[in-house]
């Protein structure tokens, strides 16, 4: 499904001055996750937002990592990963756990957590969603823009 996400031009960048964000990426599928992180970093650089990038073992660890970083004083987080469908129910359990966990952290902390965890049937889908800077749907870029938009909303 295609839609529109905020653009840097549509946001009040003065409203986000002084914010700091944690970009947290899973280590599985580095060829995809590194591109997602690069997309998020590109957005935050362009918006002149301070960021630090961290890695965790896998996508299941993303919610706790986001919570820890928000507890350490970060104003928001972006979580990035790839869960690839296999032959067992593992995919369903991981996807549900990560999605619920990330949402709960954001609600509990009242801070934005951009969701850039891909849940794909095959590698081609993941590649399509992790192209950097081509304006064609890097989900790391979109997750970063979502954080910026929520900071705008909170002002």
Regions found by a protein language model. Name each.
Residues 121-140:
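Phosphate-binding/catalytic loops
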Residues 43-72:
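Active-site rim loops that border cofactor/substrate pockets in soluble metabolic enzymes
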Residues 5-13, 110-125:
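Mobile beta-alpha loop/short-helix "lid" or hinge segments that flank ligand
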Residues 92-120, 139:
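Short, acidic/small-residue loops that bind anionic groups at enzyme active sites
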Residues 134-155:
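A charged, well-structured terminal subsegment
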Residues 1-17, 134-135, 152:
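N-terminal presequence-like segments and the immediate start of the first folded domain
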Residues 11-53:
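Glycine-rich phosphate/diphosphate-binding loop of Rossmann-like nucleotide-binding domains
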Residues 61, 65-102:
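Glycine-rich phosphate-binding loop
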